[in-house]
Structures are given as structure tokens and as C-alpha cells.
């Protein structure tokens, strides 16, 4: 069963100031915890567009949301297609959009999906099982330089070069096929002293490969910039991130649209063209409560940012 404990469930939805007849978009349906909480607040005129690139998540969500199916439109797609999705549904603007980024618990906990460095499985890490690129191709076919780049950029791994060299040496003998084979190779590239601190030694490289396989940061940047144009004035966007790269990107995008263009000096009245597109509802990100942490250890790194559309 696809069981997933949603992080900061109440805060993410409550900050959207739900209108009972509003139209909302869940860009990361996952275990549908946030969706269920939101749908309980909508009347029969309200609507939720539920997007996920994982078909398994969508099928399980249909069971979780079975009492609300008349209010939900399920979409199997990448959230970077947000504008196209809404256009196809003939929806101009929505009342709110939210994101719960990162891998859902079921994806991590089902060994066959190949996301976890604790369980042995074929290298995969595809959120969308229909796409061709998997972790196997990244590990066995990408160049040394490309591996160094993603390990450093997406994993912030300081031993990127050493790990990439070990991968290169191993795959010349035979392909690296499973998650635990890769873990062993990663450990070879990290000095023993460094392996003993900072969590699991493979954590950063696995994160980097997962982000590369699913093009996560680029997809999120594309999507949230579209979301800013798709939400009505007064509507809001909630984003939960789980690592510093996502959080930094979200903060930068919100800041950029909050700033607006430079205003020429001497204008008695500021034209609307120079007013900001949005305002950040919370200057500092909201973090998980003790209750969240007790229910889900993955909430420890979660941060919530919220923006309200002004024009």
C-alpha cells in the first residue's frame, strides 16, 4: 500500500486561505495527504487538479480520495507542464497552487524503485516510470566530468572527483547495476574518517543522481514561474522543500518576482508595470513542528515558503 505521511500538512494548505468553491492545483499529489485535507474544505463547486508523474501514486490517490472524486481531475504529467495542463482543461486562473517536493515515502521505501541506499535493487530512481533515463544510465554511461558536476552541484559532495573516479574504474570492469553496489563504490571514494560523520556516506551522491535523472531543479524552476502567472490576484503558492538547493531556488524566484522592475526616479505615482508581481507571506521559511517530527523523521529538513500574487 502506498502509505505516506504528509509533512506540514495543515500549514501548507491553511496558508492558501482556502475558498470552498475555489480551484486549486496539487503539483505533487504523492500520497494525497495534502489533497485530502484540502478537499475536505471544498464544496461541490470546488475543484482540485492533482498532478503526479508517478502512475502508482495516482492510482493509490484515487482510493484515498474516493469520497471526493467528483471534485478531482487527475493528471499524469510533469509539473513543468503546468500551463499546458491548465490550458487543456480550459482553466485560465486558479485560486492556489502547492508543491511538496522531494521523494515520497513509498518511492523511498519500495526497494524496486531504486531510490534507497539502504535496500538492494536495480539502479532506477525514475519518478516517472515511463521515461527512459534511469540511474543506471547516469552511473554507467555519463562521463567522469558530468558525474563530478552533478555530484558537486546537486549533492554538494566535496569528494565528487574521487567518487567519480571510483565509478569510472569499476564500470570499466563491469557495469554497476544495483544500489548497494553503488554504495560500496561511493564508500571507496570517501576517506574513512569522513565516512564516519555526516550521515550515510552515499546520501549526497544518491540525491544528486535522483535530481539528475528526474531533472528536478529545472522542472521546479519552470513550474513555479508558470504558477506565478497561473494564480489569481490574492491567490497563493505554497512550497515545501527538503534540501538547501530547492529552498534556495524557491527563495530566489520569490525574491525576483517580489522586487519588480527598477522604478525611474521622479515619478509622482508608480505605474502598475513597476509594482511587484507577488509578496512573500513569510520572510523566513516555516519549519516542521515537534508533532511533524514525531510522525515523520523526514520532516526535519522540510521548509515551507508561501507567496501571494499581487497583480
UniProtKB/Swiss-Prot annotation:
GO biological process, one term: rRNA base methylation
InterPro entries, per database record: RsmH, SAM-dep_MeTrfase_MraW_recog, SAM-dependent_MTases_sf
Keywords linked to the UniProt accession: Cytoplasm, Methyltransferase, rRNA processing, S-adenosyl-L-methionine, Transferase
Record carries keyword rRNA processing: yes
GO cellular component terms, A-Z: cytoplasm
Keyword S-adenosyl-L-methionine in record: yes
GO molecular function terms attached to this record: rRNA (cytosine-N4-)-methyltransferase activity
Catalytic reaction list: cytidine(1402) in 16S rRNA + S-adenosyl-L-methionine = N(4)-methylcytidine(1402) in 16S rRNA + S-adenosyl-L-homocysteine + H(+)
Protein family according to the UniProt entry: Belongs to the methyltransferase superfamily. RsmH family.
Protein name, as recorded: Ribosomal RNA small subunit methyltransferase H
Protein source organism: Staphylococcus epidermidis (strain ATCC 35984 / DSM 28319 / BCRC 17069 / CCUG 31568 / BM 3577 / RP62A)
Amino acid at each position: 500500500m502506498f502509505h505516506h505521511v504528509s509533512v506540514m500538512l495543515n500549514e501548507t494548505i491553511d496558508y492558501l486561505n482556502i475558498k470552498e468553491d475555489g480551484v486549486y492545483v496539487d503539483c505533487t499529489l504523492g500520497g494525497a495527504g495534502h489533497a485530502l485535507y484540502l478537499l475536505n474544505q471544498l464544496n461541490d463547486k470546488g475543484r482540485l487538479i492533482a498532478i503526479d508523474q508517478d502512475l502508482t501514486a495516482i492510482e493509490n490517490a484515487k482510493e484515498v480520495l474516493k469520497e471526493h472524486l467528483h471534485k478531482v481531475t487527475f493528471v499524469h504529467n510533469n509539473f513543468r507542464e503546468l500551463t499546458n495542463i491548465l490550458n487543456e482543461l480550459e482553466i485560465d486562473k486558479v485560486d492556489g497552487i502547492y508543491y511538496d517536493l522531494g521523494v515520497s515515502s513509498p518511492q523511498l521505501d519500495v526497494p524496486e524503485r531504486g531510490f534507497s541506499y539502504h535496500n538492494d535493487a536495480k539502479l532506477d530512481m525514475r519518478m516517472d516510470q515511463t521515461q527512459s533515463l534511469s540511474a543506471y544510465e547516469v552511473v554507467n554511461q555519463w562521463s567522469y566530468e558530468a558525474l563530478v558536476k552533478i555530484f558537486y552541484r546537486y549533492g554538494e559532495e566535496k569528494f565528487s572527483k574521487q567518487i567519480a573516479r571510483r565509478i569510472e574504474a569499476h564500470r570499466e570492469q563491469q557495469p554497476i547495476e544495483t544500489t548497494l553496489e553503488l554504495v560500496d563504490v561511493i564508500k571507496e571514494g570517501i576517506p574513512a574518517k569522513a565516512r564516519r560523520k555526516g550521515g550515510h556516506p552515499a546520501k549526497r551522491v544518491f540525491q544528486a543522481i535522483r535530481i539528475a535523472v528526474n531533472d528536478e531543479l529545472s522542472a521546479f524552476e519552470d513550474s513555479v514561474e508558470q504558477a506565478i502567472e497561473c494564480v489569481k490576484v490574492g491567490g497563493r503558492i505554497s512550497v515545501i522543500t527538503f534540501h538547501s538547493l530547492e529552498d534556495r531556488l524557491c527563495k530566489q524566484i520569490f525574491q525576483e518576482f517580489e522586487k519588480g522592475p527598477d522604478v525611474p526616479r521622479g515619478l509622482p505615482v508608480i505605474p502598475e508595470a513597476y509594482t511587484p508581481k507577488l509578496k512573500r507571506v513569510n520572510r523566513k521559511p516555516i519549519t516542521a513542528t515537534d508533532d511533524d517530527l514525531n510522525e515523520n523523521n523526514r520532516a526535519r529538513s522540510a521548509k515551507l515558503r508561501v507567496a501571494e500574487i499581487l497583480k
